[in-house]
Amino acid sequence: MNIKKTAVKSALAVAAAAAALTTNVSAKDFSGAELYTLEEVQYGKFEARMKMAAASGTVSSMFLYQNGSEIADGRPWVEVDIEVLGKNPGSFQSNIITGKAGAQKTSEKHHAVSPAADQAFHTYGLEWTPNYVRWTVDGQEVRKTEGGQVSNLTGTQGLRFNLWSSESAAWVGQFDESKLPLFQFINWVKVYKYTPGQGEGGSDFTLDWTDNFDTFDGSRWGKGDWTFDGNRVDLTDKNIYSRDGMLILALTRKGQESFNGQVPRDDEPAPQSSSSAPASSSSVPASSSSVPASSSSAFVPPSSSSATNAIHGMRTTPAVAKEHRNLVNAKGAKVNPNGHKRYRVNFEH
């Protein structure tokens, strides 16, 4: 999508522009899922025990992401990825994304996984410090990056997982919908604080919390309900399930969001869930609008059926705001002006 920014000088022009931009972005034929922590942190270690989904045309992932990176207003893009590309589940792609929206810098590398990521559970790890980013699989280092892009990973990031289908066949392969439904299984997640030299055995990390998904903890996790450019699916909370001690992300046809299968067995026992001390006063919730918390222009549905929508500066209903959610951000600026395949737009519903 590459829509030129237009200055609107009157209420009539605003209404006309809103009508012209109307697009049903929830009319996609497929539904995916995204899970994210409500808290963002600066530095840490993140581990997840997972059996990934894989079919040509899909992406099954674990990543760190600074909410709002996708907004083209000059702020930095901050992201660190583990992505299993469906065309080759025998490996995963590691990546750091920095720069700015429309001018991102990436550093993709590919790493073998055996057994294949969709055939067995593996423990995937990310370590993020001021000096390096390190990727591990089953406790073994597969990549470590120091300096360069790492110095640009400023601010905070939240932990996320998603399952979706890219429209870029060159990247992920031709989409094969006959393979649906697909499922990504997460047995447990551990998050560690960055505590240089003070962790177990003198390490730089101290365990903060563990989630074994015996139940879904809504005080810790949010369920995505959005889409983004280049995504064949709508990400929906209907495709996230907690069953038999496993968190499940699904990729399905629209209207068939469900999980009626058997949860696969992981031979490694899950740890007990634990909670960290409350940190909400200083954390940056990833479930907020794509603009910083200090902005007053984010759209928040009130108790009544209509509101002044900061997206278009007009009285409208939440449903209308939802229609326009991936065309403009909460500041009223056009998103993704350079048609980049990866950006996210949060919206209320």
Swiss-Prot record:
Residues 270-307 have a biased composition (Low complexity). Sequence repeats lie at residues 271-277, 278-284, 285-291, 292-298, 301-307. The active site is at 79 (nucleophile), 83 (proton donor). It catalyses: Hydrolysis of (1->4)-beta-D-glucosidic linkages in beta-D-glucans containing (1->3)- and (1->4)-bonds. Residues 1-27 form the signal peptide. Belongs to the glycosyl hydrolase 16 family. This is Beta-glucanase. It comes from Fibrobacter succinogenes (strain ATCC 19169 / S85).
